[in-house]
Amino acid sequence: MNILMALSQLEVTGAEVYATTVGNQLTKRGHTVHYVSDTLTKPFIGQFFKLRFNKRSIPRRFWHVAYLVYLIKKHHIQLVHAHSRASSWSCHVACKITGTPMVTTVHGRQPVHRSRKAFHAMGDKALPVCEAIEQQLIEELDVPASQLTVSRNGIETQAFSPTEPPKNTKPIITIVGRLTGPKGELCFRLLDECLDLEQYDVRVLTGSAMEARFEQFANQASFPGYTNDVAQVLRQSDLVIGAGRVAMESLLCGRPTLAIGEAISIGVIDQNNLSHAMATNFGDIGPNILDIDFSSIAQEVEKGLSQPSCDPAVTEAIGNNYDLENIVSQVESVYQDVVISKLQKEMPILMYHRFIDNEAKKGTRGPYIDIKLFEKHLQLLKRLGFESLTFEDFANKGTIERLNPNKRYFMLTVDDGFVDNYELMLPLLKKYGFKAVVYVVTGETYNRWDVEASENPDKPFPLMSNEQIKAMAESGYIEIGGHTLTHPFLSTLSYKEQKHEIEQNKLELESITGKPLTSFAYPYGDLNENSKEIAQELKFDFAVATNSGPLALHQDLYQIRRIAIFPKTSALGLWRKVRGNYVFRKAK
């Protein structure tokens, strides 16, 4: 995707660290990420455009919106991700003008006034970084809960691993944070009222310029300035004082951590207060500024210094909840939610069954299509610039690959595994360069489920042999998927019976093809919760239904909706089905 990250800060902030960390990871995953901000200090990959969001006069705001519209159109931006109030306001208007999907990560409490309640200016989805912000948005700004998803700060956890505790002759206490605003007031009071600057080696790690009021501490505490090697500084510390990302990174390094932010003091982090710490972004979020009992801080400092390391269980919990890979995957999922919902378009997944080359092969039950008409389908798809994807592609690249701005994708699936798939379909796929996913029944040699049907029974049509299945899998054009042994209505079977049908089919196909299966198709599109549970248990990455499941395929990877193709689906009919909005129109 083409993504624009929007920030507004004049010094390094947690929002900037978040945006660049997530942005760089998105870039590594193949996305193109641009940045627009007043300043940008942290290392980033992509283009940076300077825009003074902090200049908020009416003419300036018009300029902000106009410039953002220009950037969106010039760089074919598919989604804007804002990270501050100033940037989100202008981005919201620009995205309204251009019809561009937008999300906003909310890093702190929002001001409450009438205009803010009426005009949230957060785009299509807001991502509060903790539960306290989510609660405030709902209760004080009337933001619908459905528009909110808690998305925590993503941290490159591998860069902050525990080491042996330092052996400092004089305990090192490191305070990390800005010297401006409430954080600056907090730091000043810690130095002035709470810390014994003679007894401890106090170091203030900040990206802010030194304010005059801090000069009185220059001979008793050190102000080394900002560093890109934060982990090394944390590991050298006997106690770290900070909030937000600082506290998380310190705990990942195994250091005793006093979580105190611009709202409240959590205390030295342990398993008892960890949940409260996470909910308040480690003290940064609360209804009041500096609602802190400073007289108790000295005791907390002593408590922290008495511990050589933090509880390993706390370090593990931080890793599980803030791991960058997991957070970015969640962000990608939100991007897909917003883009698909806003544009009302989804990649078409087509469902075929049999292919015929003469009238005698027509059936009475299972859908079929004349091979000449199928070729017209492929010709149309080629002419429209489509490329094919398989579920193996999704397993390797993620479902967000379907939103690649330079591609137009569809997926071709074929159920049951009839001989005509090998004899008639495969040559045409090779001719036009398309791939397909073929779901194969292995416990039958013909379509017995149709032949023995109580109503309108069909003629027998042969299924592929093991040799043909193997040849299909090795062709480079076919992904083989599971489709049970005997093509039953799964919802009518017990859990044990379902598992036997699905598992045995999977084992047989993997034995034939020599590689693990990625996806499974429920016969008739019939399933229940047991069916989905078994598909996951057997390590299928995806499972497809027919006309059930969410309209956006990524929202339930074990009940993916497909578009059925019938004998009379003409080229014009196919064009309507592959435009992208078919499932949305059909659902209305």
Q: Across the structure, where does each feature detected by a protein language model lie?
A:
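A charged, aromatic-enriched C-terminal amphipathic alpha-helix characteristic of glycosyltransferases
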Residues: 14, 163-165, 286-336
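N-terminal strand-loop element at the rim of the active site
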Residues: 5-60, 207-213
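Conserved catalytic-core segment of nucleotide-activated headgroup transferases in glycan assembly
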Residues: 172-210
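Acidic anion/phosphate-binding donor-loop and adjacent secondary structure
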Residues: 138-139, 146-147, 154-170, 181-184
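Short beta-strand->alpha-helix junction loop in the catalytic core
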Residues: 132-133, 151-160, 180, 209, ...
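C-terminal active-site subregion of NodB/CE4 polysaccharide deacetylases
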Residues: 343-413, 419-420, 492-588
